[in-house]
Regions:
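Solvent-exposed, non-transmembrane regions of membrane-associated and secreted proteins
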Residues: 6, 11-305, 324
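Alpha-helical transmembrane segments
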Residues: 32, 313-326
């Protein structure tokens, strides 16, 4: 009788142990699946940081190679000009070309995936042409040429048939990015930008600073809204709107600092003034839409944190559920 009882007790403990192991495996599996977006975020951020650092090193290396060597680009053999300088000249020439052509090939910007220059001849195989830094949004992204899905998954992209971000006038570099991608914010917090805020774009030769001059919400097919504006050197940021949808486009127009037209400067000063009394109906509607987007972003963040708290509590219950209780 005693042996039979011990045997049953042993079997019960064994079954209990197997159940505990199964629950732990299921729990860890569920935790891993839930954490995948955050793990992807860590991996992608590391890759972005690596790409950004590599680009900076390449630019610094090129600048050091040509330091002390003054070359007259109008008379020297093009083979004697550093590759970055050649690329920069080709970018400027391309900007002049599309302005002269009236950007005739520009339709729905999201469909423009092609690289407008052959970057491989300059030793650029990944299509990265710069670094976009937006302090107000706390994001630094690699900038790629061509809006392919693969490149948009890695950072910001310059749309085809728009200008390169280099010095000059009559140019508008349209930069697009996802409204958040696999945990990386990208342009998720684009509504933080206000008129007067600044951002920088580092190209293969220099770092240019741009100031926000206007913000607008447009339809996807309103390509005329992102065309070159004569006399201005611009960067235009664009992403889907509203948050989690893509029925419209949220557009932020920026002018290179020092080249802003008088109207844009006046707009920035007006936005900074606490005495602003007139708010148009369209601006009121835009503000309400932005507040709704911000609520959705905050809700998603809160639910994500709450999910981890819930998973933690389940883990505690599993542990306490299988701790042997002392018999009185």
């Amino acid at each position: 009788m005693q042996k039979s009882r011990k045997k049953k007790e042993k079997k019960k403990q064994k079954n209990r142990m197997l159940m505990a192991i199964m629950l732990i495996i299921l729990y860890l599996g569920g935790l891993f699946v839930y954490a995948i977006p955050d793990l992807q975020k860590i991996v992608l951020q590391k890759e972005n940081e690596k790409a950004v650092e590599h680009f900076k090193e390449e630019v610094e290396g090129s600048q050091q190679d040509k330091s002390g060597e003054e070359t007259d680009s109008t008379s020297a053999d093009s083979n004697q000009i550093p590759k970055n300088a050649q690329l920069y000249q080709e970018m400027q020439a391309y900007n002049q070309q599309i302005f002269s052509d009236g950007q005739s090939g520009l339709t729905d910007p999201w469909s423009y995936e092609q690289e407008t220059l052959d970057l491989s001849q300059y030793g650029i195989d990944d299509g990265m042409i710069g670094i976009l830094d937006i302090p107000k949004m706390d994001v630094t992204l690699p900038l790629y040429l061509g809006a392919t899905q693969e490149k948009m998954a890695k950072g910001a992209v310059m749309l085809g048939q728009t200008s390169f971000p280099v010095q000059g006038t009559d140019s508008n570099c349209v930069i697009a990015a996802h409204r958040g991608w696999k945990g990386i914010p990208m342009f998720r917090e684009i509504e933080r930008l206000e008129i007067g805020d600044e951002l920088t774009v580092q190209n293969c030769q220099e770092t240019l600073t741009y100031r926000v001059s206007e913000i607008e919400i447009i339809l996807p097919d309103e390509s005329d809204k992102i065309m070159i504006q004569p006399g201005r050197n611009m960067v235009t940021l664009m992403t889907c709107h509203p948050y989690t949808q893509n029925s419209r486009r949220y557009v932020v127009y920026c002018d290179e600092v020092g080249t802003q037209p008088e109207a844009a400067v006046d707009a920035a000063e007006e936005a900074d003034s606490s005495q602003q009394e007139i708010i148009t109906t369209s601006e009121q509607n835009r503000t309400e839409a932005l507040e709704e987007d911000q609520r959705l972003i905050e809700r998603d963040t809160l639910w994500r944190k709450a999910g981890y708290v819930g998973i933690g509590l389940i883990g505690v219950l599993i542990i306490f559920g299988f701790i042997p209780r002392k018999k009185h």
